[in-house]
């Protein structure tokens, strides 16, 4: 359309230019008279004005209008030749002056853009002739000499002078538009899917899509910016917390540097106090009752310096009656048992290290953040080595260090979360940009995401298997701990029941056995590691320290206060027993809760599998969520490595500090406290009664604990069975997912079949309409051909046969329509069934979501159990080191005992004989019972007094029981600590799960948005494809109708020719017959016109382009179109549709 408009404008402009050109060329002789007047009137102001006008008009991209006018020069017969009009010399001079001085008095729309002198001259001539027309009036004689034709043309030129600038301006505007359209269309083709400016609706749709994309991008950017601001706030808060922790660490360091000085002064004071206690027999501590001394042992305010000194005194006093060979076998047995436990723990640690090797590879980024913590731990370890003598201060420092480590771990976790969230949001922004840039490559990206989803599924399966393995290892460790507890209880049961105390007959000095010292040393070492856990622990930990015995001459002073203090001690012990029972009950409830959670593990796995399938089927754009899941898994592995490294470092530091402190304190205190041990033996004999009662109560508590553990074992077995059943259910879930995929494929096939059936039905309906139209056309043709059929019966039979065929086709079409409708009615219940299956799958998805949540909780519980077992391994290693240090101290004490025995043999022959008998009896009993250290004391006491030997035996047995009870109490407290840690970690994992749920909700919202956009695009594509298919079907139907109409036309033409030949042959008939035939033939033309009118009216009134296109072949039949004519009509119909 635009090209036609342009060509029309160009045509009119060319005609006008040709007229003006002829007029200017005819008026070229009159220029002589006008030059003089123009020469005088061309002022400089006017020249400047003409130049400005020329510069304004020269902005158009056209060539010079002079060139334009020269292009449209037309050779006219009325034009005078240039040779016949010679210029006079004045005119020639004026022409030269005009060319040299510039152009004056030019029209507004004339531009001197041409650089050639000849072109400018010709343009000046033409324009001067046009502008100086009024100046020719005074030259009347020259005008009279002109011919009337020239005058007429001049008058016409004067009329055209007003219209010429407007035409030139309109031409320039049109030319600008025509030249601007080409680069605009080129830019459209390069940057948009459009090809020309003839389709504004497509351009509007494209711009709307671009605006939608920009809006989506802006929304995502707003979300990301808000998330970024929140993360920045969290990061700043975490930095502030880290700074506060650093300041606290600096304060701790400064305090640790001040403490060694105070420790030296305190050790000197303690040594002086020990000497004074040895010299002054009337010390107030020595006058205390035996029960009060026992309660002092068990008190949490017990000082380590006193306990070590008293242990050394008991060792030296006991060494007077023991031999070195008697103690070695029992120590070897203890060392062998400890070594076996160490090997078991090492094997467990190796298994754990194998599981965490992969996690350590990913923890390289955390090394820098942990270096500060390790340096601080090393410094605190150095400080602990300096402060061996002050165990109480070291315990406080260990508490501070552990609290600081926990704070550091929390800060590091927060920092990791912030960094991971920041990375996730940056990844979101990048992925959004990539998705906007690569919208055309959506299909390839979707395939890649499917592969990623399958990889994520495999990773999740591996994580589940790892969790199961960890749970099994934890169960094995728990069973090992249970076996240990049962062994300890068996040992306690195998010990003989404590007998009643017999009064001491002889005033012989009695001493405590080395086992007591070892027990106290073990308790002191254990307190260093678990001081934070054992503040509420009573009675057994420091059994020897606070009680300072009276002199050897006063073994028993006041029996009545003993009874009162004994009852008070029993009450406190009962309170401790009640506390232990409550803790055991809490553990039982916790085990029940964990078992209930474990029972729903099968449902959780089903939910996880269904979620993964939903991610594969629907969430093809879940790349962000998968990256976040991977980051969380990496974070878990990093946290595991951090926990293991910190535990190892803490255990190594505490164990080294404890070992060194014990060795040094024992070596220094043995020499100074030997004399004090002799005096304390008498008070220890009185304390035996209270210790026996305490041992009985603790034995009962141990039996109750053993029953509780036996009850917990069947629950563990049930958990193992549930894990086995979970594997079977996992396989069943896989089969179900396959069946689901098959069902979805069937659903898609059924939908395709329904669409095909609908298309077939629509095609059949169009065929029926076309057949009906054909029936109407054929009925009209039948009316027209009735007269011809009267002449020829064959034509009538043929038409009837065609009518029967057409009716048969219509019946067939109706039958096919009915069959298609029946197929649709059959397919609808199938579609309903598939929709019900989809609802069921959605419900299963919700159930699987709940199962996944519960699975995360179980995973957090398993992590807590793992960490608690690691703590147990660290404590067992510490206990092993303590046992080694005890063995060394016992060896030294045995050497001291031998030396003392040799000195005592020199005192008298009677004592030598008694000691020889004691040694012989001791050798005999060592061969019989190597594991008992009481044999040597029994032989010595049989010589002195049978009552003394019984007392010493009981003291040994009580000390062993005390140590075992201490170990059991440690284990109970470790279990309570593990419970607290489990609760804390459960809270943390709940928080983490909530964060994950929020992230998943965001990801699901984003996927829903992407899904809606994808569905909209798909629906648009389906609609466009349907339109294309409909158009193609219509074209095929039209072609088929054309072919059928041609065939019918050929048949009819043949019949008409046959009828005409018959009419020519029957020319011998009468005029009446001819008149009748003419009258009968004349109405045949009348229906043709009426039918043509009705079809044209239908064609013009029809708004549907499809039906209008179907009427084209009917018109072609009536008007006898060719193929080219039909194509032209089809194009015209389509052009009307575009408009």
UniProtKB/Swiss-Prot annotation:
Protein's UniProt keywords contain Transmembrane: no
Descriptive protein name: Autophagy-related protein 23
Family annotation (InterPro entries): Golgi-autophagy_related, GRIP_dom
Biased composition (Basic residues): 526-537
UniProt feature, compositional bias: Low complexity: 19-37, 496-522, 651-661
Family note: Belongs to the ATG23 family.
Purpose: Required for cytoplasm to vacuole transport (Cvt) vesicle formation and efficient autophagy. Plays a role in ATG protein retrieval from the pre-autophagosomal structure (PAS) and is especially required for autophagy-dependent cycling of ATG9. Autophagy is required for proper vegetative growth, asexual/sexual reproduction, and full virulence. Autophagy is particularly involved in the biosynthesis of deoxynivalenol (DON), an important virulence determinant.
Subcellular localization(s) per the UniProt record: Cytoplasm; Preautophagosomal structure membrane
Membrane topology: Peripheral membrane protein
Listed Basic and acidic residues bias regions: 7-18, 225-247, 261-273, 373-385, 475-494, 728-767, 786-815, 935-945, 977-1011
Pfam families attached to this UniProt entry: GRIP
Quaternary structure note: Forms a complex with ATG9 and ATG27.
């Amino acid at each position: 359309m635009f090209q036609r408009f342009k060509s029309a404008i160009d045509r009119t402009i060319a005609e006008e230019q040709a007229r003006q050109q002829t007029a200017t060329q005819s008026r070229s002789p009159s220029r002589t008279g006008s030059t003089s007047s123009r020469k005088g009137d061309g002022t400089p102001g006017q020249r400047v004005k003409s130049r400005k006008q020329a510069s304004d008009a020269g902005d158009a991209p056209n060539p010079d209008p002079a060139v334009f006018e020269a292009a449209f020069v037309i050779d006219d017969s009325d034009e005078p030749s240039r040779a016949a009009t010679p210029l006079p010399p004045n005119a020639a001079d004026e022409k030269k002056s005009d060319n040299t001085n510039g152009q004056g008095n030019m029209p507004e729309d004339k531009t001197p853009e041409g650089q050639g002198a000849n072109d400018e001259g010709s343009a000046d001539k033409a324009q001067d002739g046009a502008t100086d027309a009024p100046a020719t009036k005074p030259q009347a004689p020259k005008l009279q000499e002109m011919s009337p034709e020239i005058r007429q043309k001049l008058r016409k030129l004067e009329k055209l002078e007003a219209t010429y600038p407007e035409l030139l301006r309109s031409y320039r505007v049109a030319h600008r538009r025509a030249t601007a359209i080409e680069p605009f269309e080129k830019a459209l083709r390069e940057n948009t899917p459009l090809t020309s400016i003839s389709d504004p609706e497509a351009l509007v749709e494209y711009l709307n899509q671009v605006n939608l994309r920009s809006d989506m991008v802006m929304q995502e950017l707003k979300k990301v910016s808000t998330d970024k601001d929140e993360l920045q706030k969290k990061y700043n808060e975490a930095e502030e917390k880290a700074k506060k922790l650093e300041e606290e660490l600096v304060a701790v360091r400064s305090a640790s540097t001040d403490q060694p000085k105070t420790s030296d002064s305190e050790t000197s004071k303690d040594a002086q106090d020990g000497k004074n206690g040895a010299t002054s027999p009337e010390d107030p501590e020595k006058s205390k009752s035996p029960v009060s001394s026992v309660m002092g042992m068990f008190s949490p305010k017990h000082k380590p310096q006193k306990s070590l000194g008293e242990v050394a005194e008991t060792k030296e006093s006991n060494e007077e009656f023991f031999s070195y060979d008697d103690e070695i076998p029992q120590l070897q047995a203890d060392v062998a048992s400890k070594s076996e436990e160490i090997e078991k723990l090492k094997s467990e640690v190796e298994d754990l290290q194998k599981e965490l090797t992969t996690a350590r590879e990913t923890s390289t980024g955390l090394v820098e953040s942990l270096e500060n913590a390790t340096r601080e731990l090393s410094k605190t370890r150095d400080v602990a080595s300096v402060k061996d003598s002050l165990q109480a201060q070291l315990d406080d420092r260990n508490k501070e260090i552990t609290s600081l480590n926990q704070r550091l771990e929390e800060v590091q976790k927060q920092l990791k979360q912030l960094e991971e969230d920041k990375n996730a949001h940056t990844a979101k922004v990048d992925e959004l940009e990539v998705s906007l840039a690569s919208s055309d490559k959506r299909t390839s990206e979707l395939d890649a995401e499917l592969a990623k989803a399958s990889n994520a599924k495999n990773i999740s399966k591996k994580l589940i298997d790892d969790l199961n393995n960890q749970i099994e290892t934890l169960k094995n460790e728990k069973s090992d701990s249970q076996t240990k507890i049962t062994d300890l209880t068996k040992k306690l049961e195998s010990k003989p029941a404590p007998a009643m105390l017999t009064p001491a007959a002889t005033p012989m000095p009695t001493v405590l056995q080395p086992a007591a010292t070892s027990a106290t040393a073990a308790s002191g070492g254990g307190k260093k590691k678990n001081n934070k856990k054992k503040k509420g622990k009573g009675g057994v930990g420091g059994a020897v320290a606070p009680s300072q015995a009276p002199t050897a001459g006063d073994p028993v002073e006041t029996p009545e206060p003993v009874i009162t203090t004994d009852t008070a001690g029993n009450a406190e012990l009962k309170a401790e027993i009640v506390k232990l029972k409550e803790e055991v009950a809490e553990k039982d409830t916790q085990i029940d809760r964990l078992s209930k959670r474990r029972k729903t593990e099968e449902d959780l796995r089903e939910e996880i599998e269904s979620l993964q399938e939903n991610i594969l089927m629907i969430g093809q754009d879940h790349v962000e969520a998968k990256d976040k899941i991977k980051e969380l898994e990496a974070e878990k592995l990093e946290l595991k490595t951090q926990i293991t490294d910190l535990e190892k470092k803490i255990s190594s530091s505490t164990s080294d500090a404890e070992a060194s402190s014990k060795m040094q304190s024992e070596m220094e205190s043995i020499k100074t406290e030997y004399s004090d041990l002799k005096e304390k033996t008498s008070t220890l004999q009185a304390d035996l009664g209270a210790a026996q009662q305490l041992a009985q109560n603790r034995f009962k508590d141990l039996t109750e604990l053993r029953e509780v553990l036996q009850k917990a074992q069947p629950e563990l077995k049930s958990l193992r069975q549930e894990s086995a059943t979970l594997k079977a259910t996992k396989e069943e879930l896989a089969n179900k997912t396959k069946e689901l995929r098959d069902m979805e494929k069937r659903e898609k096939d059924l939908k395709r079949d329904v669409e095909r059936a609908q298309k077939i039905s629509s095609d059949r309906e169009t065929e029926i309409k076309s057949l009906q139209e054909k029936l109407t056309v054929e009925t009209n043709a039948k009316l027209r051909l009735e007269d011809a059929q009267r002449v020829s019966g064959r034509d009538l039979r043929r038409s009837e046969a065609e009518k029967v065929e057409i009716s048969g086709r219509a019946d067939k079409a109706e039958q096919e329509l009915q069959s298609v409708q029946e197929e649709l009615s059959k397919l609808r219940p199938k579609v309903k069934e598939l929709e019900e299956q989809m609802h069921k799958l959605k419900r299963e998805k919700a159930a699987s979501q709940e199962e996944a949540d519960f699975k995360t909780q179980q995973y957090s519980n398993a992590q807590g159990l793992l960490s608690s077992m690691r703590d147990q391994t660290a404590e067992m290693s510490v206990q092993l080191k303590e046992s080694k240090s005890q063995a060394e101290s016992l060896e030294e004490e045995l050497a001291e005992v031998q030396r003392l025995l040799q000195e005592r043999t020199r005192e008298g022959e009677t004592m030598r004989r008694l000691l020889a008998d004691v040694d012989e009896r001791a050798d005999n009993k060592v061969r019989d019972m190597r594991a008992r250290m009481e044999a040597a004391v029994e032989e010595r006491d049989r010589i002195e007094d049978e009552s003394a030997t019984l007392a010493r035996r009981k003291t040994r047995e009580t000390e062993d029981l005390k140590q075992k009870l201490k170990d059991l109490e440690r284990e109970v407290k470790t279990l309570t600590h593990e419970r607290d840690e489990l609760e804390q970690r459960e809270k943390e994992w709940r928080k983490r799960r909530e964060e994950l749920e929020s992230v998943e909700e965001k990801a699901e919202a984003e996927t829903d948005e992407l899904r809606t956009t994808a569905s909209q695009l798909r629906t648009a594509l389906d609609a466009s494809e349907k339109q294309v298919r409909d158009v193609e079907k219509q074209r095929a139907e039209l072609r088929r109708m054309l072919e059928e109409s041609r065939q019918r036309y050929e048949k009819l033409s043949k019949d008409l020719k046959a009828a005409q030949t018959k009419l020519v042959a029957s020319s011998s008939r009468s005029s009446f017959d001819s008149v009748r035939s003419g009258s009968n033939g004349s109405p045949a033309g009348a229906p043709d016109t009426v039918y043509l009118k009705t079809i044209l009216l239908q064609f013009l009134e029809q708004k549907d382009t499809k039906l209008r296109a179907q009427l084209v072949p009917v018109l072609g039949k009536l008007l006898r179109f060719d193929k080219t004519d039909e194509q032209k009509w089809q194009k015209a119909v389509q052009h009307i549709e575009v408009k």
